[in-house]
Amino acid sequence: MSVCIKDQIQNMNIVIGCTVGCTYCYARNNVKRWHMIEDFSDPEFFPGKLKMMEKKRPKNFLLTGMSDLSGWKPEWRDEVFAKIRENPQHQFLFLTKRPDLLDFDTNLENAWFGVTVTRKAELWRIDALRKNVRAKHYHVTFEPLFDDPGTVDLSGINWIVVGTMTGAQSRKIHTEPEWAWSLADQAHKLGIPVFMKEDLVPIIGDENMIQEMPEDFNKVLEVQKSWKK
């Protein structure tokens, strides 16, 4: 039985808003529906949420579920990174579609930096991530997968996630199973874990799903099981 990635990784929306402007953006629709901020194209920082990181029960957190790291002001990033360093019990993920706008170094052991790739024409983002974000851990999310990305240079990448379009737009987009299998095969040849998101079940088949997490994430999940809530 496949698992939902949201059960493994919790959103912590420290920044809300994004300047990228994707036409299929679920975050923009949610912000508009729930009136989270006035203007989604003008990101806002909510430093009060940093206290969530102080909880001792380990968790895996995605910090860019409602934003893009490229839209964070440097001072926001510095404050968040400092808090991450103080809380090694957690693992933290960041995503961006504009790695070309980033340029920084970090030696954080529990921070994972990734790019979203939806089509072959966006493979440059992986190279830009490795060049512009000098970090310990990298990941790539191939979602929603609009076409066959072909041969991908995954050197230095520590995890990949593969998914398709969800919601109302899913009827307009068809992800071929061969695209997902090709990515999984390429990653496995390099020893990279692969996580197929639950929306691929109708395409791949539940019995064929690959749902692997990095060992650091698995350790967090194991400790969670033994932790008294």
Language-model segment annotations:
Residues 1-7, 146, 151-229:
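Auxiliary Fe-S-binding modules of radical SAM enzymes
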Residues 1-112, 120-134, 149-154:
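Conserved Radical SAM active-site core
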Residues 61-63, 92-94, 113-115, 138-142, ...:
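Hydrophobic faces of well-ordered beta-strands that scaffold small-molecule active sites
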Residues 67, 98-100, 117-119, 144-146, ...:
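Active-site-proximal loop/turn and secondary-structure-junction residues that shape catalytic pockets
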Residues 79-82, 129-137, 174-186:
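Long, well-ordered alpha-helical scaffolding segments within enzyme catalytic domains
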Residues 86-92, 134-137, 184-194:
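Structural alpha-beta junctions
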Residues 118, 122, 173-176:
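Short capping loops/turns at secondary-structure boundaries
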